[in-house]
Amino acid sequence: MDAVLACRLRGRGNRVAALRPRPRPGGSAGPSPFALLCAGLSPEPRAGVGSEFPAWFLGGSSQRRNMALLGSRAELEADEDVFEDALETISISSHSDMATSSLHFASCDTQQAPRQRGASTVSSSSSTKVDLKSGLEECAVALNLFLSNKFTDALELLRPWAKESMYHALGYSTIVVLQAVLTFEQQDIQNGISAMKDALQTCQKYRKKYTVVESFSSLLSRGSLEQLSEEEMHAEICYAECLLQKAALTFVQDENMINFIKGGLKIRTSYQIYKECLSILHEIQKNKLQQEFFYEFEGGVKLGSGAFNLMLSLLPARIIRLLEFIGFSGNRELGLLQLREGASGRSMRSALCCLTILAFHTYISLILGTGEVNVAEAERLLAPFLQQFPNGSLVLFYHARIELLKGNLEEAQEVFQKCISVQEEWKQFHHLCYWELMWINVFQQNWMQAYYYSDLLCKESKWSKATYVFLKAAILSMLPEEDVVATNENVVTLFRQVDSLKQRIAGKSIPTEKFAVRKARRYSASLPAPVKLILPALEMMYVWNGFSIVSKRKDLSENLLVTVEKAEAALQSQNFNSFSVDDECLVKLLKGCCLKNLQRPLQAELCYNHVVESEKLLKYDHYLVPFTLFELASLYKSQGEIDKAIKFLETARNNYKDYSLESRLHFRIQAALHLWRKPSSD
């Protein structure tokens, strides 16, 4: 399969496409219209059957095989055959980053953005095509519109040529897909998939077509990489980006196994395309070949290859070993380097590279990592965006996240509120802010205000109803009974709703929803009476690594410790029941986190050891022991005992399985091992 794909990209004819990409006014090509798109969602085209793999490899009929080898577009309607569709068009979207110093924005006036569609240069041939230069120009304008909160204007600018220009197709479908991901509405998801199919077909028109002889000779020789025309090079990058996004939507569209296979194959094909494009990039640089829009192709390769390297490197060791067996590999340092190089360039994808790095620093490192965040780089990368788009929702959102990670909760609150107020067009951005504001109020123990935002999420967002309802009930559980009555909510009823609200993605339950369902069982109608959860809001705060944020604030850590110690005292006065040991261990874990944040390591260690020593007595919350071992490792690392810390990490990773949130802990262990091991140990 890999050899055949290599043929597609390497054995190109001797065409030197003269489509000159044009530098932006003022000499700088603006950030990709889709850098902005949610910290790293890339464009998303998709195409037909024969062009991705020779038909004889797919096992089609003789007529179909000949059409495929000749690059006929009759193959584009292959969707009826789900397995061939899975083999042919393979994609998943990668998260983007923000990058470095010399970031250039398109100098187009966004006020005039929805300009005349006739501005695009169209070839005079019967088959209408928009040239590369015009496609890049209009995408840069659309990017500025998007970052300026003019989402509909950006769509309308790109829509007229979305079936003729690869970059219009990529930009248009990316915005539609982003909207689908944010709303989680089935109709929006279907619209995203439809837009993605059209985009892939549009990109397919620009990809290299093979004759039978070329297909056969390419199998025997790598050919000359530089023989790929500039337009065809861009078509490969756009096609790969579209495949990634289509794969992402495939996972959320339905939970059946066929969609899971299709999505996985799309990812693999996209990955292989990026590998081949990286080889082409190196060949061009080595031979110093002249291409007018080389910087745009380079930006696309850096974004795709860098994001793949970064994301694959985050995976737990056991998954990495499996993926390496089927041809994947990831290197975190290389991925960050490629993204930083892409971000420092002048391509449209520079902004996407920046946003990918920002997503890594402000979200991924916290939720799936140790909480050790490179805030300085995040601030440096965001600075040019803040200057250019001071009221852009996406820019403000990242600004608020950075303030939050610095412990400036009050400043973060103000910026999140501003992010909500600057636009009404995409309410989904509001939901992201509601989530953050809910947690800020949890950190501050402003329970009524936290309830307000959790209630908004329950009513307006469809991302994870089970999680939202559980959190609302958990927050209400922290309030005095009279305050709960004033809300007209019934905590027991809310907890009992959780199980019916859980969903599946790619055929799998969402780990945090499974966790919420298990915890809510204590309120099941089948029990003689509900057994009240202990500190459920703080437990969820721990699950989302909120104690890492609170560690920057001594006052908040002290207040949380008071709350935990009150719960500890209340437990000691209660009658013993089947949940008592589990509740006691949870309280000890939370107390240990507070003590560690307050620089009281010996007391924290005593709390953690109590949990580990109670392992055999736990009946329900078996996740507490491996997570506590991780906290002990973190404690020892902070005291300079690296070898001891690594030993505890390996114990947590190797000696425990089948507990709640296991994959999340394995992600954190992988991140910690990567950061803490000496270079020689790697």
From Swiss-Prot:
Top-level division of the source organism's lineage: Eukaryota
InterPro entries (alphabetical): Iml2/TPR_39 (IPR019412), TPR-like_helical_dom_sf (IPR011990), TPR_rpt (IPR019734)
Key word Repeat present: yes
One Gene Ontology term from the biological process aspect of the record: cholesterol homeostasis
Keyword Cell inner membrane among record annotations: no
Alphabetical list of PANTHER family matching this protein: TETRATRICOPEPTIDE REPEAT PROTEIN 39 FAMILY MEMBER, TETRATRICOPEPTIDE REPEAT PROTEIN 39B
Protein name according to UniProt: Tetratricopeptide repeat protein 39B
Organism: Homo sapiens (Human)
